[in-house]
């Protein structure tokens, strides 16, 4: 199963492996950024909600300050401002219902604001009630003052009519006291209106009760018109008391509204603190949860990074190590090196292609080196045979040269004999027989020389073909070296690309960069070895070309020698026939002496030509022997170079 996964991963190219690894890391990084952004947005929203709660608490203080200002001045604009503040608070709370804050605390805050607004409406109504009561107090107080002033005038008139009557004076004083008590009641009521305290209330009602009791005591004791005025004044006092009662009811309602607003203010403060604390706890818990999420994602990213590094090491570095080992083995001359892991050759990525190319290169080099080794062995054998044949040819040519010199000497003697033929016919006949015998020997020597020279030409052709095959094999070696050079350059480029990718990966790709540098160094050494082998092959090709050229020259010279030898054979045949004619026509020797002398001179020149050709053949044989030795030396050197490779 593990090998199957490794093979599936190996089907991906190196670029796709890197893209997948870094893509997942970037995706995790994007997830971290998104999570951080969500956390920041969430925390910002919670902070804004807490700021909204703090603003609500500030608006609560503003509403309380507006209430106090309204209570102090009873300004309707101030009351409207308080109502707008409360309405704005309700709108903000309505907007916060969809938030993550405590719904119960929000509902309690809404209820507290509603209660506060209701209490404030009661406070405003109580203020209006007190204002109306103050108007009633002013009107009824003025009526009471007018009634008591009328009563006092009547009593003063009655006292003037009843001058000296002590009871009338006493009643007049009592009425004056009632007027003073009314002024005191008004004073106490005014103090109660301004203070609205329980003490002022008690003082006002106590003064009013004292006034009413005193007025009740005087009922029926005053004269008829004065008594009616007293009743009217008592009615005014009753209306005045009703105004006081109305004002007191407004004060009580105001106090109740104040207590309700104080309670609502406390409830709003508690709800605000509850919301603030709940929001703070929610923010802390959310921050803790988000931190845990970020740590989890970071741990996943770290774990995947480690797994990706391990996978890259398994999928890239190890195959590169195997390719490095195989390239080192090839550079060391071991062409039988095989990958240790058979799955490496089944990979479809660039590394698998590199392994397969290295494998094919090793196979091709092994086959080529084997063929070169066989060809070099054949070349060495052919060179040895050629050297032996060349030695034989050189010996034959030297013998031919000696024989040709002998023929030339004989022909020279024959020419002298022809000149003396007239004086000594028998000597001429004897000389003719000797010439015939020597001509036959020369003919045999010439035939032998022709045979050996033709054999030499055949061996030259074989040597030329061997040199052509050697040249072709060296050219094939050059093409293979071009392939090796191309593979080394591709390996160098791949190692350079791998080093660049490792540099981009940072610390995670440092080991990969070291391996890539080693691969580049190996590729450079491979290129150097390839250059050395290429230099050897070029020198071998140059030597082979020179040997082929020399063999071609030798072949041409050998062909010329064959032609000249044939001509020499023809000349010897002519000499033989001529000598036979001399023997047959011994009687005509004298008359033909001049002609024979001429013929002898021509034969002498031909023999000299044959000797020159023999000398050229000897020189060509020397050159061929030297070329054969050089060819044998090159074959030995090539065998030594090929022996460096282990098949």
UniProtKB/Swiss-Prot annotation:
The membrane spanning regions, by residue number, are 17-37, 292-312
Q: Which UniProt keywords apply?
A: Cell inner membrane, Cell membrane, Chemotaxis, Membrane, Methylation, Transducer, Transmembrane, Transmembrane helix
Q: Where in the cell is it found?
A: Cell inner membrane
Please give, as recorded in its UniProt entry, the membrane topology of this protein.
Multi-pass membrane protein
Q: Identify the residues that the record assigns to the HBM domain, covering every copy.
A: 45-287
GO CC aspect terms: plasma membrane
Q: Which GO terms describe its biological process?
A: chemotaxis; signal transduction
Q: Where is the HAMP domain?
A: 314-370
UniProt topological domain (Cytoplasmic) ranges: 1-16, 313-647
Q: At the top level of its lineage, which domain of life is listed?
A: Bacteria
InterPro entries registered for this protein in UniProt? Chemotax_Me-accpt_rcpt, HAMP_dom, HBM, MCPsignal_dom
The annotated consequence of gene deletion is: Deletion of the gene results in a drop in the chemotactic response toward alphaKG to close to background levels, but does not alter maize root colonization.
Q: Name one GO molecular function term.
A: transmembrane signaling receptor activity
Chain ranges on the Periplasmic side, renumbered to this chain: 38-291
Q: What induces it?
A: Expression of the gene is not regulated by the presence of alphaKG.
**Where is the Methyl-accepting transducer domain positioned along the sequence?**
375-611
Q: How does it assemble?
A: Ligand free ligand-binding domain (LBD) is present in a monomer-dimer equilibrium. AlphaKG binding stabilizes the homodimer.
Q: What is this protein's record name? A: Methyl-accepting chemotaxis protein McpK
Species source reads Pseudomonas aeruginosa (strain ATCC 15692 / DSM 22644 / CIP 104116 / JCM 14847 / LMG 12228 / 1C / PRS 101 / PAO1)
